[in-house]
């Protein structure tokens, strides 16, 4: 009798598993349909424009109560950026494991910080936002971005009202505006994280080859998994946020099993598993002098490179792991906008097709086709091979590339510092060097090229 009951239970378990797999398979198939992608992008764009309009309405408030206007704009910005996070966390089901010192964990989300991330993946900006969301600072997160992005609807306009630091990548033009923008953040009422991609552009083998040629010419240790960091943006940010920001978070992102995540994969509901290593470094331990700060950043990237090497061998970062829980607010915000915007869209489509007008139907189809092209174009902008060019002339990669050989041996620190200072002074005379094409890389700003 017991054997019969056991067999029945096993059969029931198998049926449940088969039913679950079938449901997951159907849901996974649904996620891959272009209609779903179109709806997701429709909701994002329309809700984004609505939020941009609401942000515009806060302009009078800035002259009355600046701090209140800032807080309102943080909440409005969250309505946009959290949709992207919900896409990663809830739609694709991507998981994120955090490697960090448990003693540092209580500080996350409770202090202002500069976050230094590697720039190897198409969705690393999205993982950075997810990191911010897990600790409640997504709405107030900052980046150093190209000036052109300020004119882009939805994200660019959102960033404008968030007081994002924009730059043209020409230091002689940027110096005044960048410094003023950073100084304005000194009295920001919300805890914020300032995200920096010090490499300035996404890693590719072609860019890496050019970068290491410069490293060889300048006597810098070569990096295997990173481009040479552009030190100017980092040093200026540290200098002008000192006293407000209390720490730098050295962050390194990787994906398990050599996965190469893409935004299109996320839209298709493909699940990835991200590993994020975060090391908290008190800002007081970073040199105030610009040349010494540049040396410090180069050493940091040597350490990041060694960390990446360990990950490639072992498949994990050193230290204990933590899994910050997903917060429900990103999903609830996303569902709110979906419900709000899909209902009028469905009514409109029903009325259009009910009219029976061939012209109306053809116009609707053409608009959908144009929208699909727009969606594909936006996705294409995140591809690694669409990143900025890296330049071919000597001196274009890094304004501080004249730094003499930096080693990890303490016995050579003094000589290295002296050589670095001399090299940086020489490089300050080369402001006019221009990169081939549209991207100016002669004077590093460490901008985020998402």
Residue ranges with predicted function:
Residues 87-263:
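Soluble catalytic domains of membrane acyltransferases
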Residues 134-138, 344-365, 374, 426-428, ...:
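Cytochrome P450
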Residues 2-114, 127, 398:
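Membrane-anchoring hydrophobic helices of lipid-metabolizing enzymes
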Residues 44, 48-49, 59-63, 86, ...:
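N-terminal pre-first-transmembrane soluble regions of secretory-pathway and organelle membrane proteins
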Residues 2-52, 322-380:
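Alpha-helical bilayer-embedded segments of polytopic membrane proteins, i.e.
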Residues 190, 210-338, 359-362, 367-405, ...:
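Catalytic lobes of large eukaryotic enzymes
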Residues 1-22, 106-107, 244-245, 387-450:
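Cytosol/nucleoplasm-facing, intrinsically disordered, low-complexity tails
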Residues 77-82, 152, 230-234, 271:
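A structural signal for well-ordered alpha-helical scaffolds and beta->alpha junctions
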